[in-house]
């Protein structure tokens, strides 16, 4: 029934015509019915709750130092989009960026082999999590104590303003770019609107109006706003849990046996008539699933006609230029104010015995200290003024001979047009001054 659904339209269309068609062909054929689908509000805990769970590992996997520790804190509700975006920035600043302080202190103190952060805002009551992987469950209390002491120190001395600036730019850049890879943009926008629409019918578009929020957060960065969020929600908030998940060998087999026993008990409770009906129903379902569609049903599937497909191929906007002896390809297309840069270096000049080390080199460039920056400051500086600088290796096939290949070391970067000179400066900083001797 459409009363228990959410419908949205995306694209350049005659909206009135589409709405009328939807009403005539679909909605008008149903009577209105009440639907109780409001998500309930969980009351805050009076104290932090402790939970222990188990997960299955194979006989060859270790049980020692293979636990997960997580500290999870509820952060208001998802209808305050500015606060949600602020916590996305705090997740980046405290846990995700290289040199992030919360991640750094936990790793230095030997809490787990990896530290992850997350801010889950796709639900009515979002939560912020700090997670230690490959940890010792005996470190649970120290894990929580270190988190609290680190956060208290950050509140006292202030969040790194350059990291906040980088976090805001990092998230704003991706919002403006709206690059969802192979996923249709309209689909992803639709998923975004559910973050508020599901919980307030009057707020379907809040998640699509973030540009003003980014501007507001930039102004609040020096006002103590982010420190207040940490104090209120991460330090003075008992609506939280500490969850320990321990490995257990044979747990999967135990669960499979329990399920088999439950099914056997259910089967034993059935009469012969009920068993025969169950077998018949299963057979009918299998036949239905395997049956070929009728010609009538196949004709209901919309199909493209040949004339619907343009005979014109997509225009390629390639302009060849030369800067000294370097070939430059320039693509003059609409990129919403974002400049995309790719530098390619032919690897034929790399000695064969050193080629395997190129994979290591591309992984550390941008993640080690340079002449003017430590690795954390370098990462924040780049993200504060660009959409990132990435190093990689690509292999190109000859357009005339698919048996010929050219391996290339590459650098990809993106920024607003005004910051392209900055991007070149940072590429130069990384390539010429990275301290690769730092083990």
Each model region followed by its residue ranges:
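An aromatic/glycine/proline-enriched structural segment found at the starts
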Residues: 6-66, 157-160, 178, 263-267, ...
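His/Glu-based metal-binding/catalytic segments typifying zinc-dependent metallopeptidases
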Residues: 35-99, 129, 184-207, 269-366
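Core subunits and conserved enzymes of cellular information-processing
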Residues: 230-233
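Terminal amphipathic helices with adjacent charged low-complexity linkers/tails
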Residues: 34-35, 243-263, 267
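C-terminal helical/tail subdomains of lipid-metabolizing enzymes
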Residues: 210-213, 217, 256-274
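M16 family metallopeptidases and their MPP-like homologs
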Residues: 4-10, 66-76, 103-218, 238-248, ...
